[in-house]
């Protein structure tokens, strides 16, 4: 599903099998007060996200760790294999430090345990999309 605001300047892929989290993230992105507006695409698992990444370019991926068909870490490995430089914020209910270290070693921008603070998420989203030197480049 794709949602676009009238002045969308950045494209975000939300990957999570929990539709309540997807709705929360979509709503939050619409409320953030920094200079960007977002075109949002969603995927319910890593396999659908991989198809979206083949089809489109994104400025940011918000990624759940544990999903059916392909985990977040498996998707990250595929993204790196494709040489995608898209910043990834990994959102997870797992607060295990080893898992966080593995995710960070995979090249994610930030590891965010659930439940997360929306102000903290807003700050990280702003930093991540601003870290790109060119819009939606591979």
Feature locations, PLM:
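C-terminal output helix
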Residues: 116-126
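Short, conserved "switch-loop" micro-motifs in signal-transduction and mechanochemical regulators
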Residues: 82, 94-95, 106
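Receiver (REC) domain active-site loop signature in two-component systems and cognate sites
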Residues: 67
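Acidic catalytic/metal-coordinating carboxylates
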Residues: 45-48, 71-74
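Active-site beta3 strand of CheY-like receiver
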Residues: 56-62
């Amino acid at each position: 599903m794709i949602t676009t605001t009238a002045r969308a300047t950045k494209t975000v892929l939300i990957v999570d099998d929990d539709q309540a989290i997807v709705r929360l993230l979509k709503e939050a992105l619409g409320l953030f007060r920094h200079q960007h507006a977002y075109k949002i695409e969603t995927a319910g698992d890593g396999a659908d996200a991989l198809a979206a990444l083949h089809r489109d370019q994104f400025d940011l991926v918000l990624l759940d760790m544990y999903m059916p068909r392909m985990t977040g870490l498996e998707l990250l490995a595929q993204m790196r294999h494709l040489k995608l430089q898209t910043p990834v914020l990994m959102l997870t209910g797992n607060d295990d430090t080893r898992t966080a270290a593995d995710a960070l070693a995979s090249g994610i921008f930030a590891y965010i345990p659930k439940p997360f603070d929306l102000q903290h998420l807003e700050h990280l989203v702003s930093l991540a999309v601003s870290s790109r030197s060119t819009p939606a480049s591979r």
